[in-house]
Amino acid sequence: LRYIEMDSPIAFRGLEDLSGTAVLVERLGEKMYRELVERRAAAIITIASNKWYQADADLLPTEMRPNYLKWGALPTFTVRPYDAAAMLRDGAATLRLELRQRSYTATSHNVVAVVEGTEPTDEWVAVTAHYDSTSITPGAWDNGSGTAAVMGLYRHFLNHPPRRNMRFIWCGSEEQGLLGSRAYVRAHQELLPSCRMCFNFDMCGSILGNNEISFIGPAALETMVRQVCDEAGFPSNVDAYVDSSDSAPFACAGVPVVCPSRGHWTSQEMHTRHDTLDTISPQKLHEMVAFSTALIGFFVNAPDFPIAREIPADAAATLEKRFGPAVP
């Protein structure tokens, strides 16, 4: 057994051949996985999460995504942080590992509703949320809350048609690697040049925490989002960063994105059996939908679309590094 904390050249110095070695890693990114395949590691042991240091912490099944498997297949296991620390503390040197797995093909669906605008235009705005969860969790916060928020927004704009067209997309299989949103972007290349923005909702309405709005787009976008927050009396952090959610494939295709959410380190129960409805505040979810109605309305009802359809070069480079080419 060998513990490799990170995928830096220094951490791998002198470890050109890991044959017969099970490698314990803090986080299994694609770069780390590729290094271990190329160095012929016998197996990989990932740590469930460094946030949950309990002996009974939930364990998610290990799922290998296609972008990992293109480098080769390695037996991969997951242990709790409690057990990982115990192995290192006790000086475990030899392990016996037994792998039980099943391979299967499943079908996932996106659910799409279109609201046609009142003015003749090809321009449209996407509103997205993933409706799936992980296999061990009820998924109230992640992402039943975002699913419900988009339904509330759909009902509003269905009854109050906007100037521009809108597509409400409930994406499947986000937790398996943004598969639903990637498939949608890949299948609708002819529509994307007319897509002016994407608003994505992933985890909203938690009782504890604060509102967060991440965005990727031209500099003017931040000013406009802050303006709507101020006018609506909606306190929120507003920051430019790349979020790993269904907005990413749209951003990779050059579409500016805005991602309202709500949460805090005290409410990090996603991907566990504790992600239940009692962590959700109907009032906070309603406030998010009311604010987002105003925010989206600011853009879809403007006489001329307020921002350019562009992604800053530095953000585009980060997107390509994390998520791959523009057509995922």
Predicted stretch roles:
Residues 1-10, 62-140, 152-155, 159, ...:
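Soluble metallo-hydrolase cores and metallopeptidase-like ectodomains found primarily
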Residues 76, 135, 162, 171-269:
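Metal-dependent peptidase/peptidase-like ectodomains
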Residues 28-31, 49-53, 83-84, 102-105, ...:
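Solvent-exposed loop/turn segments at secondary-structure junctions
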Residues 26-31, 78, 140-148, 160, ...:
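Soluble non-cytosolic domains of exported or imported proteins
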Residues 1-75, 236:
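Extracellular/luminal Protease-associated
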Residues 3, 22-25, 43-46, 76-78, ...:
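Structural recognition of the beta-strand scaffold that forms the well-ordered cores
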Residues 3, 20-27, 32, 72-74, ...:
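Second-shell loop/turn segments in exported
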Residues 155, 267-328:
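His/Asp/Glu-rich mid-to-C-terminal helical/loop segments that flank catalytic regions of hydrolases
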